[in-house]
Design a protein with these regions (language model features):
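P-loop NTP-binding core
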Residues: 1-278
Length: 278
């Protein structure tokens, strides 16, 4: 089982699109694949599960979800009843693995553990109770059930992102060719290296995924060359901009199912092949 985190502390760089489309290609190639959505915006969840995973003031988040899992990790009884009831609740929650929170997507071999908009509210209590390794332990129990796991993370270095990095083998870093993304990259890589040193020496930076790359424009080419000159692991397969991505989001269909021969789909295919060879 191979577990990848798609992570960037900067928002708007295509984390969810990259997560879902690589996962969809993985599943399309016959690999049993799971997407875990740790971003309260739930873009990956909605991309794959459509209206079922949308939420609003009048519509709660789809359950069970990743927030429910972390609530169960905390072991808080649902009621303030007798001690026996409390202990029974704790034992029941302890026995429940991550597979109890999985939803099947409409696509063969592709499952999802959806996010919840209120997930962030649990971060402080999870930190205070030292639950940072629980996701890693839960994923180890899934070994044999999935070939590939992709984790979408929030645009912040917080409890949930750190949990994902501790649980993963590899991290993919989406990158837009602008000065703000480049400035944020050093801090991001420092955080990953610190996680390697302190928590997870198995974790590898699989590469920087250049998204929205305009090959005809001078600035993107210069920025990418600067990254390479600095010795950063820029992946050769880059993702061009295309309006078809918006159509893919709107129809809740990953590119491999919506337009398999499109140039952006083919770019994703090349990217998947490149990272799988590592």
């Amino acid at each position: 089982m191979r577990t990848r985190v798609v992570f960037n502390q900067k928002g708007g760089v295509g984390k969810s699109s990259i997560t879902v489309n690589l996962a969809a290609i993985s599943a399309h190639q016959g690999l049993k694949t799971l997407v875990i959505d740790l971003d309260p915006q739930a873009n990956s969840s909605q991309y794959l599960l459509g209206d079922d995973a949308t939420y609003s003031a009048d519509k709660p988040a789809l359950e069970p979800n990743i927030e429910n899992y972390f609530e169960d990790v905390l072991g808080a009884p649902q009621s303030k009843g007798l001690l026996g009831n409390a202990i029974g609740s704790l034992l029941k929650n302890r026995s429940k693995g991550l597979d109890g929170y999985v939803h099947q997507s409409p696509f063969k071999n592709l499952d999802v553990i959806p996010a919840s908009p209120s997930l962030g509210a649990l971060a402080h209590v999870l930190e205070s109770k030292h639950k940072i390794y629980k996701l890693r332990d839960a994923l180890q129990q899934l070994n044999g059930q999935y070939d590939r796991i992709f984790i979408d993370t929030p645009p912040a270095f917080n409890f949930f992102t750190l949990s994902a990095l501790i649980a993963a083998d590899r991290v993919l870093i989406p990158f837009d060719c602008d000065v703000f993304s480049k400035r944020a990259l050093q801090t991001l890589i420092e955080n990953v290296i610190e996680t390697q040193d302190d928590h997870n020496d198995r974790l590898e930076i699989e590469g920087i995924v250049v998204n929205q790359f305009q090959a005809q424009a001078k600035l993107p080419r210069e920025v990418v060359q600067q990254l390479k000159d600095e010795g950063l692991p820029v992946l050769e397969s880059m993702l061009p901009p295309s309006i078809i991505m918006k159509e893919s989001h709107h129809k809740n269909q990953p590119l491999i199912h919506l337009a398999a021969e499109h140039k952006l789909t083919q770019a994703y295919q090349l990217l998947f092949n490149e990272i799988e060879k590592k």
